[in-house]
Amino acid sequence: MKKPLLAALATLALTGVGTAPAVASSAAPAPAAAETARAVSFAGTVSLSNCSGSVVRLPASEDDDPALVMSNGHCLETGFPAAGEVVVDQPSSRSFGLLNASGSRVGTLRAGKIAYATMTDTDVSLYQLTSTYAQIRSSYGISPLTLSDARPTAGTAITVVSGYWKRTYACNIDGFAYRLKEGEWTWKDSVRYTSACQTIGGTSGSPVVDNATGKVVAVNNTGNEDGGRCTDNNPCEVAENGTVTVRQGINYAQQTYRIPACFGLDNKLDLSRSGCVLPKP
């Protein structure tokens, strides 16, 4: 996983190795590839205490619905969910720094609850805010990003937008991992980036935006840092026939197109809805 930054800093203090890029990168220039994706801005992205995220709406969301913030399951303030664990409707008062198009913080949003979170099959957290989309737009002039309900395709030009670092990473979808295994967790049908997206610690939870549509197609979550095989911070790809592939320096995201089917009226989570395949508690 692209470790939450606080954990990465703690590891660095103890060991002096392993997570230095998460610290050093604050002064590093943005990747040159980002120059090709200027149309994708920071508007609607958020910074968490340890990760990145975004204010998102579903295709059927209405302006008076409570807004949602999406990040990774491993970015929860309560720690990493165990394999098989699903968090639903858990109270939360977490705060998020809302960014405008240029990456400046324009306000603070607050959660009322964790609507859904897991690290099983996918790595996602969805917070329900105390504000509606209309209230956010009225107060800050910021609209949410829209989650696509269509599966992305290989070759798609994408931008990973980190609200924590206020940096973007532009590349393409290289392909998909049938299973991506990291430590005790396994994720399905993960997005593999081309090598240009060198995401770092703190970019966890960043929205992955389809440059052509402007819609969110995935949430950034991990990468193989050291060439390890299926260990923490060193995920491996497992093919349908069981073949294991390690791609050192390659980073990954989890697809989000299945999320809209699990929410109904008023942005209310309903895991029993037809077409909803997210893991259940």
Predicted stretch roles:
Residues 31-42, 47, 57-61, 77, ...:
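Conserved catalytic-core segment of clan PA serine endopeptidases
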Residues 244-281:
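PDZ/PDZ-like groove recognition
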Residues 48-50, 64-66, 70, 91, ...:
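Extracytoplasmic
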Residues 60-67, 210-215:
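A glycine-centered beta-loop-beta connector
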Residues 1-28:
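Secretory targeting and sorting signals
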Residues 144-171:
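Short glycine/Trp-rich loop-beta-loop segment that forms part of the substrate-binding cleft
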Residues 76-79, 224-226:
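Short glycine/acidic-enriched loop and turn motifs that connect beta-strands
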Residues 40-42, 47-51, 135-142, 167-259:
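Active-site region of chymotrypsin-like
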